[in-house]
Amino acid sequence: MDIISSASAVVGLVFNFATAAKTCNAVRGRYKAAALTLDSIRQELETLQAALQQLANLMMHDASALTSQWDTDHSLSGTFARSMKGFERTIKGIQAELDTLKSEKEVLGRLDKAKVVWNEDGMREHLSRLRSQAGALQLLLQVLQT
C-alpha cells in the first residue's frame, strides 16, 4: 500500500470515526441505561479519530512513515493495510448497530422503545473490538518507529 493510499484510508476512517461518535452522542440521550457504554465507545472513537488524523498528517509529510529498516520482506505496509481494514470493519459494525437505535424522533414513545432493544453485550463487544484494534495499531506503530 503506497503512502497516498495509506493516507487516504486513514482519512476515510477519520470521517467514519467522527460520524460514529456523533451517532453515539445522539443515541445516548434516548437510552439512559446505556449512557456509560455509549460514552466509552464515543470517547474511544474520538481518541482514535484524533490519533488517526495525526497519523494521516505524518504520512502526508513523511513518505517513509510506514517503513522500517528492519522490514526486509516489506510486509509492514500490507500489515498496515490490514489494520486499516480491521478498523473499517469494526467501525461499520458499530455504526450499523447505532443506526438501528437512532430515531428521527426527539423523544421515544413506549411503542418506539418496544421496537428497539438495547444490546449491552453487543455494544460491549464492539467496544472490546475497538480497543483491540487500537492496541494492534499501537504495536504496529511502535515497530515502525524502530
Specify the residue positions occupied by each region the protein language model found.
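Regulatory helix-to-disordered linker/tail regions at the edges of structured cores
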Residues: 85, 103-146
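Amphipathic alpha-helix face/heptad-repeat signature
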Residues: 9, 13, 37, 41-44, ...
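A structural signal for well-ordered alpha-helices, especially hydrophobic packing surfaces
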Residues: 45, 49-52, 56, 81-84, ...
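N-terminal amphipathic alpha-helical segments
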Residues: 1-75, 79, 104, 141-145
